[in-house]
């Protein structure tokens, strides 16, 4: 279930996911 949720979330946000990833890294 978690894998599917992450897949849908990543698909919906797409580019935004990268922005959030950078925020998490920083």
UniProtKB/Swiss-Prot annotation:
Family membership: Belongs to the SPARC family.
Organism: Neovison vison
Function noted in UniProt: Appears to regulate cell growth through interactions with the extracellular matrix and cytokines. Binds calcium and copper, several types of collagen, albumin, thrombospondin, PDGF and cell membranes. There are two calcium binding sites; an acidic domain that binds 5 to 8 Ca(2+) with a low affinity and an EF-hand loop that binds a Ca(2+) ion with a high affinity.
Official protein name in the record: SPARC
GO cellular component, one term: basement membrane
Disulfide cysteine pairs (residue numbers): none
UniProt KW Nucleus keyword: no
Subcellular location: Secreted, Extracellular space, Extracellular matrix, Basement membrane
Keyword terms of this UniProt record: Basement membrane, Calcium, Copper, Extracellular matrix, Secreted
């Amino acid at each position: 279930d978690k894998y599917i949720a992450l897949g849908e979330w990543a698909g919906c946000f797409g580019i935004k996911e990268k922005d959030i990833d950078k925020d998490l890294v920083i």
